[in-house]
Every structure is written in C-alpha cells, then in structure tokens.
Design a protein with these regions (language model features):
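Glycine-rich SAM-binding Motif I of class I
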Residues: 94-98
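C-terminal substrate-binding/active-site "lid" region of AdoMet-derived donor-dependent transferases
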Residues: 165-222
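S-adenosyl-L-methionine
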Residues: 1-81, 119-151
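Short beta-strand element of Class I
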Residues: 106-111
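A short SAM/SAH-binding and catalytic strip from SAM-dependent methyltransferases
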Residues: 153-165
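Conserved SAM/SAH-binding beta-strand->alpha-helix loop
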Residues: 114
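Conserved class I S-adenosyl-L-methionine
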Residues: 83-90
Length: 225
C-alpha cells in the first residue's frame, strides 16, 4: 500500500514542480520513513477531513517536510546549545515531532487543526515515546492562533502551512511570549514564503539552504531584548 503512495507522491511532485525533484524527494522519503519507522507521506486535502476552527480557507494541503531539508536544519540546530523545547505549527502526521526526538529535543509539541492528522501524529510519536521515555510529546488538536506558547519554548517550526493572515497572528503570539519571558528564539521555516514577516519582526537569518531550486529552509533567531 505504501508503494502506491510513493508513486502518487512522485507523480504529484513531478507534475507540479519537476521530475528531478520528484526522484530526489522519493529517495529521501523512502530513506527517511524507514530510518525513523514512520508513516507520514500520504497527501491529504484538508477540505475533505474534519477541521477544528474557522481558518481552513487559510490552508490547503497536508504535505510533510522533506527529510533532507529537515535533517539539515536539525543538524544546524544541534550546534546551538539550549534548544530542547520545540513547537511544530501545523504538525500534520508528526514527522517533525518524531525526528526532533532523535536530535535531542526533550519537549516536543505539535499543533494542528485537522483531527485525522492529529490522530496520525499520535500514532507516529507513540513509538518514539518508547524509544525516548524522558522526552515529552504533546499533540494538540486546535487552530494554531489559539495556541498559548509555553514560557520556555524556544524553537518554532513551520513548513509553509498557512497564508500571511495566520502567520502574522502566530508571529504576534511568539513575540508576546518573548516579551513576557525573555529568551532566545529560533524559527525553523521550510519553504519560507512569508519569511519577511519574521525579518520585519526583528528576527535575523542565521542559516539558509536551497536545493534543486524548490526545496528551501531558513533558520532565523531573535535574541532577548
């Protein structure tokens, strides 16, 4: 059954972007799913599944972040001490949450407004709870604009999950949290189409990766004021 999903995903990427990217993506999808023992590849149209909140028109399709990009980002973050608490906005089926545990994060939260995706995320991180018993995993099924950021969360992950309206609201919540509890914050943003929102809010880009034209990752930071 998973082989069928790989074919569909390869075709989806090839038709919409390029077949070179499709072959690259499928290679890393198969490698990553096997390496981390996950089931996160299947595409989902959000309009066909149950959504919590009123912001579905600000989102479109569930698609997990490419494993190559994800691992490169976490490898960079490993060099920066103190990054242990991660929030994944639009966590989907929990790929980022699961992989983050392998890179030393001890508190990992995923937020998504699609109930079916949250259930899938719970299933995927369940194995990681056994593998990393000291790591706290929490999947929250809610609209990200309603999420109350924890005072010690310092890494925030995005994979272009929302449009500018939702992203502005989430960035505002992050800034409010940083003012209330001053700390260094890091943004890990794959396919960063709204990167300017963070830069305008005082974040500085520390790392940028671009692969095969379409795969992009930006890591930005903001020091405590």
């Amino acid at each position: 059954m998973k082989f069928i999903y790989y074919i569909k995903y390869w075709y989806f990427i090839g038709i919409n972007w390029s077949f070179l990217l499709a072959f690259f993506s499928i290679y890393h999808e198969i490698k990553g799913e096997n390496k981390y023992d996950l089931d996160t590849i299947e595409l989902d149209r959000l309009k066909t599944i149950s959504i919590k909140g009123d912001n579905i028109h600000h989102s479109s399709i569930y698609q997990a972040c490419n494993y190559y990009i994800l691992e490169k980002g976490f490898e960079f973050l490993e060099k920066i001490k103190g990054n242990k608490n991660l929030a994944d906005f639009g966590c989907g089926k929990g790929r980022v949450m699961a992989v983050a545990a392998h890179y030393g994060f001890t508190k990992i939260t995923g937020i998504d407004f699609a109930k079916a995706l949250c259930v899938a995320a719970e299933n995927n991180v369940r194995k990681k709870k056994l593998l990393f018993p000291s790591t706290s995993f929490n999947v929250i099924c809610d609209d990200v604009v309603n999420y109350e950021i924890e005072p010690d969360q310092n890494v925030f992950f995005f994979f272009n999950p929302f449009d500018e309206v939702i992203m502005l609201a989430v960035v505002k919540n992050i800034l409010l949290s940083l003012r209330a509890n001053p700390r260094k914050a890091l943004i890990m943003y794959a396919n960063p189409v709204h990167k300017e929102i963070f830069l305008s809010a005082g974040f500085i880009e520390e790392y940028y990766l671009r692969k095969l034209e379409y795969l992009e990752l930006s890591i930005m930071s903001k020091e405590p004021e």
